Amino acid sequence: MKLWFSTLKLKKAAAVLLFSCVALAGCANNQTNASQPAEKNEKTEMKDDFAKLEEQFDAKLGIFALDTGTNRTVAYRPDERFAFASTIKALTVGVLLQQKSIEDLNQRITYTRDDLVNYNPITEKHVDTGMTLKELADASLRYSDNAAQNLILKQIGGPESLKKELRKIGDEVTNPERFEPELNEVNPGETQDTSTARALVTSLRAFALEDKLPSEKRELLIDWMKRNTTGDALIRAGVPDGWEVADKTGAASYGTRNDIAIIWPPKGDPVVLAVLSSRDKKDAKYDDKLIAEATKVVMKALNMNGK
């Protein structure tokens, strides 16, 4: 009799345990299912925010952001092509740093007034003496000097060589074909001198944060970009006070306005961000505020706007 009673109690206990497990599993599934609509709503809200900016500024946006600490991303037209404009200067200097030693950067490059193009704020002052590769990189990244970009591009073998080096680091998208300032004339549907937000983020990360360059050269590249003089109204204007930004801006026909950047919050790992934009008419003007406002949406989507 006692044996029968004990067996009955064991069966009841097992049934209760089984029911509890099923109930817990149901709760877990409910929690998972509950979080999915929330995430979907956040993504919908983010896309709506970007779409509103496009309508407000009469422009098209291409955005990709990567939080390198969590691998979270923000994407809006991340694989649509835009003229890369002067953002390519960051990747050009990245390849230069791959090919040249730190000592080689002291090599002096001579040039003439025939090498000056449409925007040469630094190189035009040094025609008589020439400039070192290091000085040219500084001029290209910090002042967006077009002659400096062209002289560096010639040093690494021209646009075709730049393209080959980008392919080696896994960038199958970015398509350099011309020198400054011709590279800024890109008509809708053309692929020459274009890239995507995702590709630019991936390549910038490879040069500045990963092992495509040794640490000493990464620090040099980042230092130049942190001291950029052309980006105060763009991504820098869209991040909270106290954050560090290393960026490279660009502008081209069809109201193209771009900025690619590495962003360091006070706490946490860097975010790599590309904000690309264009308009419908060839002679359209751009508005820097669009880039700043889009950056704010990215920060909100990454839950970093008040971090």
Curated annotation (Swiss-Prot):
Binding site for substrate: K248, T249, G250
GO BP annotations, alphabetical order: beta-lactam antibiotic catabolic process; response to antibiotic
Keyword terms of this UniProt record: Antibiotic resistance, Cell membrane, Hydrolase, Lipoprotein, Membrane, Palmitate, Signal
Post-translational modification remark: Large exopenicillinase is the primary secretion product; it can be converted to small exopenicillinase.
Database matches in PROSITE patterns: BETA_LACTAMASE_A, PROKAR_LIPOPROTEIN
GO cellular component, one term: plasma membrane
Catalytic residues identified in the record: S86 (acyl-ester intermediate), E182 (proton acceptor)
Principal subcellular localization: membrane
Disulfide bonds: none
InterPro entries per the UniProt record, alphabetical: Beta-lactam/transpept-like, Beta-lactam_cat, Beta-lactam_class-A, Beta-lactam_class-A_AS
Keyword field contains Plastid: no
Bilayer disposition of the protein: Lipid-anchor
Induction: By the bacillus licheniformis protein BlaR1.
Listed GO MF terms: beta-lactamase activity
Lipidation feature positions (S-diacylglycerol cysteine): C27
Signal peptide: 1-26
Other notes: The class A beta-lactamase family has a specific amino-acid numbering system, sometimes called Ambler or ABL numbering and often misspelt as Amber. A multiple sequence alignment was used to derive a consensus sequence and then the consensus was numbered taking into account insertions and deletions. This allows use of identical numbers, e.g. for active site residues, despite differences in protein length. UniProt always uses natural numbering of residues, hence there appear to be differences in numbering between this entry and some papers.
Protein name: Beta-lactamase
Lineage, broadest ranks: Bacteria, Bacillati, Bacillota, Bacilli, Bacillales
Name of the gene encoding the protein in the UniProt record: penP
